[in-house]
Amino acid sequence: MTKLIFMGTPDFSATVLKGLLTDDRYEILAVVTQPDRAVGRKKVIQETPVKQAAKEAGLSIYQPEKLSGSPEMEDLMKLGADGIVTAAFGQFLPSKLLDSMDFAVNVHASLLPRHRGGAPIHYALIQGDEEAGVTIMEMVKEMDAGDMISRRSIPITDEDNVGTLFEKLALVGRDLLLDTLPAYIAGDIKPEPQDTSQVTFSPNIKPEEEKLDWNKTNRQLFNQIRGMNPWPVAHTFLKGDRFKIYEALPVEGQGNPGEILSIGKKELIVATAEGALSLKQVQPAGKPKMDIASFLNGVGRTLTVGERFGD
């Protein structure tokens, strides 16, 4: 039985962990995840999905603010683990820890070498990729730069957003890891170096990148909106107030970028640099998320054709 330390944080990681727990070829000696954080307006302390899954399984849990140089890292190195599996952990692993293991692999939610970094699923959508995927890779000191053990792709559809793609790729990652790990441990797979000429990066989304620029095409804005749904959520401004857009569809239309072209009972069409967007799910300032019909029947009922979104 191979003894593992698992490291991860969000739902994506929890799905991978649960997969490992169903396989009797592995024993999880410890789980490492990010510390509990205060979330939401009420600052409620929330455990990570990986911590919740580990508690349910009765596993030992470590939550260092920073793994490097921590007492927790020293404890982990004394457990006698054969290897480490990480999936969206959110911290760099010190070389000292990596070197103490027979192997260390990462489940990364992109088709490397494309989209190295912390937001690969967001960028796959924002940049209009036709496919997404998961790469199982060896861990090295440089971020997401290790040799590739295996890859598996799925198509991206127009119905996908960050939430749906996270769910799909979590299952892909779980299955790919379970399919790949035994042969890798046995030495039957020769990892493939990444083509450095094809590397792209997907750093965490910055707040200024959430703002919509109506001078882009309808397709570019469509991709940006779904590439930030359900988090961090794209926004614009309406009458000086922040206005979040969760869902929109590209449609035909022509006008000044940001201009309202038409208003119906269940339809609000806004011009872009090329074509237009039909807004479907929005959140006005100080209000909950709502469908466009609810918005137009409520706070949006005073809108008129010709008014503009934007600064």
Curated annotation (Swiss-Prot):
Organism superkingdom: Bacteria
Top-level class of the enzyme under EC nomenclature: transferase
Catalytic activity entry: L-methionyl-tRNA(fMet) + (6R)-10-formyltetrahydrofolate = N-formyl-L-methionyl-tRNA(fMet) + (6S)-5,6,7,8-tetrahydrofolate + H(+)
One Pfam family here: Formyl_trans_N
Keywords on record: Protein biosynthesis, Transferase
HAMAP family attached to this UniProt entry: Formyl_trans
The protein, known as: Methionyl-tRNA formyltransferase
Taxonomic source organism: Streptococcus pneumoniae serotype 4 (strain ATCC BAA-334 / TIGR4)
